[in-house]
A protein has these predicted regions:
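Gly/Ser-rich "nucleophile elbow"/oxyanion-hole loop immediately N-terminal to the catalytic nucleophile
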Residues: 112
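Alpha-helix N-cap and loop-to-helix initiation/capping positions
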Residues: 94-98, 163-164
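Short Gly/aromatic-enriched secondary-structure transition segments
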Residues: 42-49, 98-107
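Active-site-adjacent structural elements in enzyme catalytic domains
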Residues: 104-108, 174-177
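Basic/polar, cationic surfaces and motifs that engage anionic cell-wall
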Residues: 1-90, 115-121, 127-208
Length: 208
């Protein structure tokens, strides 16, 4: 596992001051609901041939474009993950760059006109490699669960039908201890949140 700070993945600053919050030893588990197993043929093509779409999140601000860009980035990430699992060894730099691009995409979407939040919703973003990315600073209020935004929000980049990797699970437990989180539940277990998040597979893997 490697932990990447906001400066390392290229975070934009919050649009306003974030409210302080104590997690009280509590965490809330989410998934991105973006299938990392999505087939490339089902994804829209880049608007310009050969264009690096994951560099355009800040310039293409409409919610529909942001969603398409995130889907493309996750599809590209899935190809690299499949190869990495076959090859083994260290996580290649290209895979890390994909992860950073996806996190930037999440932040751009969350701060954009569709959501209008001050910053990325979650405090921690976890990938199949076990790498974790700093989202909102710990000790600030998130935007991830009604009535529970004071808790530390963990987002696993996976969707319904995906199985979390062992690296994901191990990294989550290692990080939550560092974050002072002793008790955690799934998003759907928080009162007032009508959702299937974080999905059946992650719910089972974490015994939620």
């Amino acid at each position: 596992m490697k932990f990447y700070t906001r400066s390392e993945w290229g975070a934009a600053p919050p649009s306003d001051d974030l409210s302080p919050a104590s997690n009280g030893g509590q965490g809330t588990v989410h998934y991105s609901a973006s299938r990392i197993t999505a087939r490339a043929k089902n994804m829209p093509k880049p608007e310009k041939p050969g264009e690096k779409w994951y560099r355009l999140w800040r310039n293409k601000a409409t919610p529909a474009v942001q969603r398409r860009n995130i889907s493309r980035a996750i599809t590209d990430y899935n190809r690299k993950i499949a190869l990495w699992k076959k090859m083994g060894g260290e996580v290649p730099p290209a895979l890390v760059e994909n992860e950073k691009a996806i996190v930037r995409g999440f932040q751009a979407f969350h701060q954009g006109p569709s959501r209008g939040w001050l910053d990325i919703a979650y405090h921690r973003i976890i990938f199949a490699t076990g790498n974790i990315y700093e989202g909102r600073p710990l000790g600030t209020t998130g935007a991830h669960a009604v009535g529970a935004n004071h808790t530390t929000g963990y987002c696993f980049v996976m969707g319904e039908g995906d199985e979390p990797t062992g690296q994901m699970i191990d990294s989550f437990h290692e990080q939550r201890v560092k974050d002072g989180v002793r008790h955690y539940v799934g998003h759907r277990q928080r009162p007032g949140n009508s959702t299937s998040c974080p999905g059946a597979a992650l719910t089972a893997a974490l015994d939620l």
